[in-house]
Regions:
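Hydrophobic/small residue at the entry helix of a nucleotide-binding pocket
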Residues: 32-33
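Conserved N-terminal Rossmann-fold NAD(P)-binding element of oxidoreductases
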Residues: 26-28, 51
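N-terminal charged helix/coil linker that caps or initiates catalytic domains
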Residues: 1-25
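Glycine-rich phosphate/adenylate-binding loop
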Residues: 20, 108-113, 120-128, 135, ...
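Conserved S-adenosyl-L-methionine
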Residues: 41-47, 135
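Glycine-rich phosphate-binding loop and adjoining beta1-alpha1-beta2 segment
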Residues: 45, 50-88
């Protein structure tokens, strides 16, 4: 039996072979990135580099695929690797348990990737990722803000220059223009951010000024849309 038989019917032998031979790096394995990895693995992508320095916490359970009571405290990169190999034992998976940013960018060979997915939260890390991807000539798709939103139908995939509404998109648009970056593909939402109804008591992660509210059905849809775009680009 072929685990990917139904996908093969849709994509054909040529498409499946392209996915099997593809190497995709996913930076950030949270609410969005976890679903990106899941869909890529189930689509038959043959090699995945999974990058995240964080561990699963109890507050991740409401929205993150990798977060279960049984995985709390486990490295997200390791949890993702185990899950991918349970889906496709033949996949080549590298778990990078480290924070990606300007200081660690040189540790990654971007010329070895066929596609890069940015599901990182911080602007400096996102810009460092775009910088290295552009230098290597490797396609990249960046996820912008998915927090403080309730309507997953408002997501769009487009060029950074065509974004609107999203506060993170505004910052990234300005920074990309300043650096002369063109043709940066992003996922963003046209939904106006929803103000939090309560003040968070969680400790702020590094580089974050506040914690957005979140629900399971928004970042998951973003991740699946991104994975779909990556697959379509890879088989073209």
């Amino acid at each position: 039996m072929d685990a990917f038989a139904r996908t093969r019917l849709l994509l054909g032998e040529d498409g499946m072979e392209k996915l099997k031979n593809a190497r995709v790096a996913v930076f950030g394995l949270g609410g969005v990135g976890g679903y990106v990895v899941e869909a890529l693995a189930r689509s038959g992508v043959g090699a995945l580099d999974l990058v995240d320095h964080d561990t699963v916490s109890l507050t991740n359970i409401n929205r993150q695929l990798l977060a279960l009571h049984s995985t709390v405290g486990l490295s997200k990169a390791e949890a993702a690797k185990r899950r991918v190999l349970d889906i496709n034992p033949e996949a080549k998976v590298v778990a990078h348990e480290k924070f990606y940013g300007p200081d660690t960018a040189a540790e990654f060979d971007f010329t070895g990737y066929d596609y890069i997915v940015d599901a990182i939260d911080t602007v400096t890390a996102k810009l460092a990722l775009i910088d290295r991807a552009k230098a290597a000539g490797t396609p990249i798709l960046c996820c912008l803000g998915t927090g403080n939103k309730l309507d997953p139908t408002k997501f769009q995939i487009t060029d950074i220059s065509k974004t609107s509404v999203c506060p993170l998109a505004r910052v990234m648009r300005k920074e990309c223009a300043k650096r002369g970056y063109q043709g940066v593909k992003v996922l963003f939402s046209t939904e106006d951010p929803i103000a939090a109804k309560l003040e968070s008591t969680e400790e702020l992660p590094e580089g974050r000024r506040s914690l957005p509210g979140s629900v399971a059905f928004v970042p998951s849809v973003a991740g699946l849309l991104i994975a779909g775009e990556v697959v379509k680009d890879l088989i073209r």
